[in-house]
């Protein structure tokens, strides 16, 4: 089976171009199995704000206490994931919403005590996911379940998406409000792994892009053939990426 993992950023979910679903239907008609992974940071922040809970971050990662976890789980599963599945089904693209608990999709462990209920994926149930792909478009949110302590955990959605891509040895399209990796304010079309550390050391890659490219580097080292970072608000962006005719950045082992 040929898979493509598509990570849809929280900022893109509310402004997702309608052609994305049609492009995904087209992939499936060609026996390519897309897997959607999403987070929902802006929606979580809004839900926390409505409950007068201030979000707290350490080193760019959300600290998730028990109250925050309850709201995060409800927001991602009941609100964001359900709404996304509904969009797909309304366009006659049969989708199924999943978290890590469903079909024992993936196992997790606690990331670090200081971050509270934040987990990292450890094992992907490839058999379950492969079977679901033959029937539906899986739409996976970033909530996992820890079988050892019986608790739900929040997972960084980028980390989860890269983990799934590496486990399946599949390419990943990372769609957000970012057009690609910028060097001197210009989107670079290719970023070989060997150049990443140099760009970071020189300050050309900085801020929130650093964890994105380092996660991409790790995914490629673990089996993902390539990572594409592009804007999810462009028409027919998935088809354009598949046909290698797009504005964005392809991160890969070596330049082509």
Curated annotation (Swiss-Prot):
Keywords: Amino-acid biosynthesis, Arginine biosynthesis, ATP-binding, Cytoplasm, Kinase, Nucleotide-binding, Transferase. Its EC number is 2.7.2.8. InterPro entries: AceGlu_kinase-like_sf, AcgluKinase_fam, ArgB, Asp/Glu/Uridylate_kinase. One of its GO terms (biological process) is arginine biosynthetic process via ornithine. The keyword Lipid biosynthesis does not apply. The keyword Nucleotide-binding applies. It is found in: Cytoplasm. The record marks 7, 212 as: Transition state stabilizer. Pfam families: AA_kinase (PF00696). One of its GO terms (cellular component) is cytoplasm. Pathway: Amino-acid biosynthesis; L-arginine biosynthesis; N(2)-acetyl-L-ornithine from L-glutamate: step 2/4. CDD domains: AAK_NAGK-like. Belongs to the acetylglutamate kinase family. ArgB subfamily. This is Acetylglutamate kinase.
